[in-house]
A protein has these predicted regions:
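Substrate-binding pocket helix/loop in short-chain dehydrogenase/reductase
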Residues: 99-100, 104-112
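C-terminal helical subdomain
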Residues: 182, 198-234
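Conserved glycine-rich Rossmann-like NAD(P)H-binding loop of the short-chain dehydrogenase/reductase
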Residues: 34-49
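Conserved glycine-rich cofactor-binding loop
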Residues: 20-21
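Residue(s) in the substrate-gating loop at a strand-loop-helix junction
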Residues: 143
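Active-site helix of classical SDR
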Residues: 123, 159
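Conserved NAD(P)H cofactor-binding loop of Rossmann-fold oxidoreductase domains
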Residues: 91-96
Length: 256
């Protein structure tokens, strides 16, 4: 089991899943810009620009995290070869538009395999290979969609809610012995949001999201939630009585 002993940022290594597009790729770019070595893991390397692939400080690892057997072996090998990894950003996720009337079990399984179970797989391998302490950062990418049940989010929302609970559970167990970060973005321009037909308030670019995350990930605090005020509005929904909450959702998302 490896201990983190690297103090020079030039020697630090960050491990990022879901690294081929959206926030994941933007985080790879931001960490490279900050001088880190980056290990980016994703199922598709064709989306990553050649200039990033050719960067000597970037290593791409191709695997489909929903294929647990092959991913377990691949990630285990990566961790064994990279003792200086000090930050783990578990960002892999998929989004399938869904509602009660059109969802099916296959889509539900695909969503939870990637969005939830792949995170558990990564964490199992992290704790196996590293002696986690306050020098390490474990960041879990959830979403403001996980704060409360929303119409037409019967798969994605619950998967992100599970990650919020998971991050809270790890933090409540580790306290200050591990820098645990829960990341809950609002609407970000990603392949996932491109399929949405509804208005997305405070939509922001992945690059801006990555800058916010990097600016806060090593500071005090547990949750990185943005943008304001959208995140505050979504958080407010968590404390509303159900009767009032459902009246609001009925008004805002009424059937047409």
């Amino acid at each position: 089991m490896q201990k983190n002993s690297s103090k020079n940022i030039q020697d630090r290594v960050v491990f990022i899943t879901g690294a081929s597009s959206g926030i994941g790729y933007a985080l790879c770019e931001e960490y490279l810009r900050q001088g880190w070595n980056v290990i980016g893991l994703a199922r598709d390397d064709t989306k990553i620009p050649n200039e990033t692939i050719d960067n000597p400080k970037f290593e791409f690892v191709k695997t489909d995290l929903s294929n647990f057997d092959s991913s377990k072996q691949i990630i285990d090998e990566v961790f064994k070869k990279n003792a200086n990894i000090s930050t783990f950003i578990l960002n892999a996720g998929i989004y399938i538009p869904d509602s009660l009337n059109d969802f099916n079990f296959e889509n539900a399984k695909a969503t939870f395999d990637t969005n939830v179970l792949s995170i558990y797989l990564s964490i199992e391998l992290i704790k196996k290979n590293f002696e986690l302490n306050s020098n390490y950062t474990l960041a879990i990418m959830s979403s403001t969609a996980g704060y409360k049940g929303l119409p037409k989010s019967i798969l994605y929302g619950p998967s992100k809610a599970a990650l919020i609970n998971l991050a809270e559970a790890i933090k409540s167990e580790m306290h200050d012995n591990l820098n645990v970060k829960l990341i809950c973005p609002g609407f970000v321009e990603t392949p996932a949001t491109k399929v949405n037909s509804f208005k997305m308030p405070y939509l922001m670019s992945p690059k801006d999201a990555a800058k916010i995350i990097y600016s806060k990930i090593y500071k005090k605090g547990f949750e990185i939630s943005f943008p304001f005020p959208f995140n505050s509005i979504m958080k407010f929904g968590k404390v509303l009585p159900y009767k009032l909450y459902f009246k609001i959702t009925e008004k805002k998302f009424s059937k047409k």
